[in-house]
Each structure stands twice: as C-alpha cells, then as structure tokens.
Amino acid sequence: GGPGAFAVTLGGRGPGVYRSLRYCVVGGGISGLVAAYRIRAALGERADITVFDPADRLGGVLRTERMGGQAVDIGAEAFIARRPEVPALLAELGLAGRQIGTTGVRPMVYSQARLHPLPADTVSGIPSSAASVAGLVDAATCAKIAAEPDRPLRWQSGSDPALGDVVADRFGEQVVTRSVDPLLSGVYAGSAVGIGIRSAAPTVAAALDTGAASVTEAVLRVLPGAVGGPMFGALDGGYQVLLDELVACAAPRWVAASVRRIDAQGPGWAVQDDTGRTWPAEAVVLAVPASQAAVLLEVPAPRSAASAAQIPVASAAVLAMRVAAGTPFPPQSGVLVATGEHLHAKAITLTTRKWGARGDAELLRMSFGRFGDDIARSAADDELQTWACDDLATVFGIAVDPIEVVSHRWIDALPQYVPGHAEMSAQIRAGLPPTLAVAGNYLDGVGVP
C-alpha cells in the first residue's frame, strides 16, 4: 500500500493547507477517518467535518470483533511494520505502545495437495534462484529458473506488464501458480495474470528500469537484507483501537447515510444524502470504493469518473473461528493456497500461531473469494462454515468443531491493480476540481499500508 490514505490533497495543495470550514467526507473507512483527522489537525475547531457512511459502524474494511474474550480483526488484520506510515500515525496518535508484532513463524503453501514451506529469498514470490522454490516446482521449472539469467531480456523502461506474464515467460507457469499467486491472492484476491508488475513488485520493476540484465538479477538487487523486527504489525485490541482514536481526535459529525450526488454550488458543493437532505461544503473528500466514486464523480468530474469506472474489483468473505484450545494445528502461521487446488479457501490464518496466544482460545481465520468468482456474494454462512471445516480436514487432517464463528463479507472491496493502474490513478486525480479530493485503496495501494 502507499501513503495516499494518510494525506489528503485538495487542488494540488499539500496536506494541511485548507481555506474553508465545512468539509464533507464521503466514506467512513480508514481513508475517510484519516482524512477527517488530518483536516481537524490542520484547522482545529474552525473545521466543521461531516462523515457519511451508512454502515453499522465506522471503519470500512477494518472491523474488529470479540471472540473468546479476545479482539479479532476480520477485515485487514496487519500492516507492514517495516514501512513508516502506520507506525508514524500510531505514534502521532499516542498509540505506539499498542503496536504488536508477529511471532516470527512463517506460513506454508498448499500446492499439489501437499503442504510446502513458503519459499524464502523471493520478492512477491518471484524466485532469486532455483533453490528458493525447490520442492515446490518440478525439475524442468527449476532448470528454467537456473537458466533465466543467461536468456536475453526484453524490457521497456516504464512499462507495466502483468506480473504473471513476466514470471511465466522467464521462470515458467508453475512459479506463477504455486509461488506468486498464493501471495497475491491474499492481498488483491486476484492472480498475477491480472496484476501489473509495478503494483505487485515495484522494486523489481524499478531494478529492471535501471538496467538489471535479468529478472533474477533484479530480484537479487532488491531482496531485503537482514532487517530487525517482524515484517507485519497489528494493534493490541485490534484495529478498533486505531479507529476509535481517529474518531475521537477528528470529532466529526457522523451521518449514517449514503451520498446520492454531489453538485457544484457557488464556489463550493452541495452534497445530497439518500434521505434527501443537502449539506453545503467548501470541500469534499470522496473516500469510497472506486465504483461508488465513479457514480458520484459523474457530474462534478466526468473524466475522473470514467477512469474510476475502469478499475475492476473483487469480493471476499472472511470466517473467523474459535476452536478448542490445544487443537493440534502445525506450528506455522497459516496456509496460502496455490491456484488450481481443490479447496474452497484461498488462505488459512492460524491467528494464535501468528500473533501469539492471548488467552486460552485457539483462533483462526479462513478467507474465501477471488476475482471473477461470486463466493462472497452467493455462499450462505453455513455453507462457508462447512467449506472451512472440510478444508481444515483436507489440509491438516484435523476434524474441527468450532465453538464460535463470526463472518463478514467485503463486497467489491478489493480493487485489481491491472497493468497501467498508476496511469488510471493519475487520470482520476488530474480530472478533479480544486476542492474535490479522492482517497482510498484503489489509488496508491491496497494496504493500510
């Protein structure tokens, strides 16, 4: 993910430069709440901030539930602790002491109906050598990987081909389906065949731009060295801790309604909600998914609307389960599922293994739904639970009888960063009037970050 969720720019002016008092923020997810917080931090009590969101609670795809006396995130569950944005925001809000890290155990990959160690020394699953994926792919693929540095490379600087096309051409299809896809399906709910290399592996693309003679060389250039501390972080108490603090600091008016349309009104805007009420504002921040932004931008920014409408989206469902303490799961943090396996889930997170035991409950999460399928929309809750238990039996050989189950569906919530995505994002911003801004996970990165 990128820093876009943490900075709101109006009319080309940097964060913190605001001339008006009434602000309407459409969307109460993390992007909308951070936007409201930034406005409040810049203007103090002079700002009148209204957040529109029809959901039963604020937070968008960040959603914390209680299971077995513990907080469990059933939307996004982690951020990249080695990036500066979230730790800096937590420190700014006085929450640095609530940051926690993973236990350090790694996940596995389920491929060819077997469990394998997650490949080491890769970038987004792209191998640095045949040894890094040995055992996961066949001998012919290993030979192709070993020979890749000696094959001529055609690379156009600045281009953004699908990561899957590049990896399949240079290393073979098995590397795509068994090493790259399991990682990307968790982030995008999509496949490498539909995600641009600059979104999925930006450092590799940059290394190729600057003269790496092969993809192997590009990966070796950018492999992270020995970095202290865990890669992923979370919050003690779940993301609800962050959401509550943002709301407390931003002190917005929350209108539990959708926005129907936005019209120019003098130098400002008239924001009409779905109850028919109109709210005047000097500036508006649209922090809703791309498909909703496309509809709301049709009148005030038609070129931006057309670009936003081009961004494909996926849906996902998450099932969190509490099972009997001592259930004999393996010590790893979970399982990422390769493309084409006969499972319903795309990932299994052994929450207690990943984050450490916080009580006597054994917690896990099952994720369902990929780009192009309708599982998140159509599968009933009891069907998801049956699939989850079946998959656990298939993968681990364990019969699980959940004590408690919580599920949630994220419909059209996962944008697909198709080749050329950055250009689409730039076009959306370029077409905006000066006092209309956008924010969200379809612009600069899907992470928190």
Give short role names for the model-derived ranges.
Residues 82, 169, 287-288:
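Short, well-ordered coil/turn residues at beta-beta hairpins
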Residues 68-155:
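Dinucleotide-binding Rossmann-like beta1-alpha1 core, especially the glycine-rich loop
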Residues 260-378, 382, 394-395:
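Mid-domain catalytic core of redox enzymes
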Residues 40-67:
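Glycine-rich FAD pyrophosphate-binding loop
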Residues 31, 57, 291:
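Conserved Rossmann-like nucleotide-cofactor binding loop
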